[in-house]
């Protein structure tokens, strides 16, 4: 069958025999995307994009709609699993030098930004306390743009404050962006199949390739099954694991929560934003925390593609992971000592990875050439 059908034969390409479990996260991300789109569709059927009815419509979905609680919890927990998979996927790309496949990496970075935008718009929709205030804080960052900032913010809000028009357009954007993500995911996969996948050794896989199906397709199915099992376990036993307690109260513009914070998957970027006392500087740092990923294909200096055989670069990589976790943790804390200093130090270390990595590559090259 795969040999006969052109669509199947073009997608089930031979792959290097030694690709590890870290290569399964692409298919897991596609599963998450399918799950989020389908559950989101059923939620959109019952949701009302009105500031007076949005919170009530969420309660209606949970209590009155048959299996509405399943759809709502799958969608909320699925978003967290989506980001767990995408961050692992990016970390794998950094570790094994997959960013050298430039167009795949750049399209992936755009996908990440689209996904973050979609998740942000979705977080506003329940119109709970944290939804409202997170939207207020993040959209307010647009005012930091010189000259046009205030006009741009008013245009986005559809008025002089976050109100009914804001919720309506956020719902429209949250509905349409996943289809853009699906389209760009297709481009991402086509670009990957253009050059083929890399492997843990960073060597040319052409000398030892095996059919994708059944060898790697079953491996993909195993990891996807584990992920879906984990999703259902969380949904059954701890459905509110990733939810903020503040969001169980309806949005009140007159009462500010003690500590405004977005969902956990935005905390590292939010932590970098908060660590800089200047509004414009913080906004630029927030953007750069994601945009800096686009520099890696152009700053790779090592003769060796993967970090598998580069112990010093491995140390640098795991420092980056520890820094990412530290920034995420500090962003959950109030803006007071010692968290301000920890956050600032961690932010400097985060960005310095992308500067030290090329320098370390040159040093390694020099060391390998000396006898």
From Swiss-Prot:
The keyword Metal-binding applies. Belongs to the cytochrome b family. Heme 1 (or BL or b562) is low-potential and absorbs at about 562 nm, and heme 2 (or BH or b566) is high-potential and absorbs at about 566 nm. It is a multi-pass membrane protein. It is found in: Mitochondrion inner membrane. Heme b b566 binds at residues 89, 188. Heme b b562 binds at residues 75, 174. One of its GO terms (molecular function) is ubiquinol-cytochrome-c reductase activity. The lineage of its organism: Eukaryota, Metazoa, Chordata, Craniata, Vertebrata. GO terms for cellular component: mitochondrial inner membrane; respiratory chain complex III. This is Cytochrome b. PANTHER family: CYTOCHROME B. Keywords: Electron transport, Heme, Iron, Membrane, Metal-binding, Mitochondrion, Mitochondrion inner membrane, Respiratory chain, Transmembrane, Transmembrane helix, Transport, Ubiquinone. GO terms for biological process: mitochondrial electron transport, ubiquinol to cytochrome c. Its cofactor is heme b. Coiled coil: none annotated. A ubiquinone binds at residue 193. The cytochrome bc1 complex contains 3 respiratory subunits (MT-CYB, CYC1 and UQCRFS1), 2 core proteins (UQCRC1 and UQCRC2) and probably 6 low-molecular weight proteins. It holds the Pfam family Cytochrom_B_C. Component of the ubiquinol-cytochrome c reductase complex (complex III or cytochrome b-c1 complex) that is part of the mitochondrial respiratory chain. The b-c1 complex mediates electron transfer from ubiquinol to cytochrome c. Contributes to the generation of a proton gradient across the mitochondrial membrane that is then used for ATP synthesis. The chain crosses the membrane at residues 25-45, 69-90, 105-125, 170-190, 218-238, 280-300, 312-332, 339-358. Binds 2 heme b groups non-covalently. Disulfide bonds: none annotated.
């Amino acid at each position: 069958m795969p040999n006969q059908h052109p669509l199947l034969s073009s997608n089930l390409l031979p792959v290097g025999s030694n690709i590890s479990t870290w290569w399964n996260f692409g298919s897991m991300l596609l599963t998450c995307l399918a799950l989020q789109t389908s559950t989101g569709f059923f939620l959109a059927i019952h949701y009302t994009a009105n500031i007076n009815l949005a919170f009530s419509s969420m309660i209606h979905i949970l209590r009155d709609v048959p299996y509405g609680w399943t759809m709502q919890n799958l969608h909320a927990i699925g978003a967290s699993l989506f980001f767990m998979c995408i961050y692992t996927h990016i970390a794998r790309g950094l570790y094994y030098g997959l960013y050298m496949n430039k167009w795949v990496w750049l399209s992936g970075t755009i996908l990440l930004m689209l996904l973050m935008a979609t998740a942000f718009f979705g977080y506003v929709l329940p119109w709970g306390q944290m939804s409202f205030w997170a939207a207020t804080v993040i959209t307010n960052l647009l005012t930091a743009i010189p000259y046009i900032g205030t006009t741009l913010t008013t245009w986005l809000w559809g008025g002089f404050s976050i109100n009914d028009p804001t919720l309506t357009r956020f719902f429209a954007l949250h509905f349409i962006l996943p289809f853009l993500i699906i389209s760009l995911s297709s481009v991402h996969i086509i670009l990957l199949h253009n050059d083929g996948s890399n492997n843990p050794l960073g060597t040319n896989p052409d000398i030892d390739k095996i059919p994708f199906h059944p060898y790697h397709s079953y491996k993909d199915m195993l990891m996807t099954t584990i992920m879906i099992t984990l999703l259902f376990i969380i949904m059954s036993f701890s459905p509110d694991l990733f939810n903020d307690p503040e969001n169980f109260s309806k949005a009140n513009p007159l009462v500010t929560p003690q500590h405004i914070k977005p969902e956990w998957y935005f905390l590292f970027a939010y932590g970098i934003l908060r660590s800089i006392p200047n509004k414009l500087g913080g906004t630029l740092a927030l953007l750069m925390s994601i945009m800096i990923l686009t520099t890696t294909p152009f700053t790779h200096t090592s003769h060796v593609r993967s970090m598998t055989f580069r112990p010093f670069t491995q140390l640098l990589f795991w420092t980056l992971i520890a820094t990412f976790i530290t920034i995420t943790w500090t962003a959950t804390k109030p803006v007071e000592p010692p968290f301000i200093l920890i956050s600032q130090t961690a932010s400097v270390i985060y960005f310095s990875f992308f500067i030290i990595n090329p320098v370390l590559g040159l040093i390694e090259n020099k060391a390998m050439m000396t006898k």
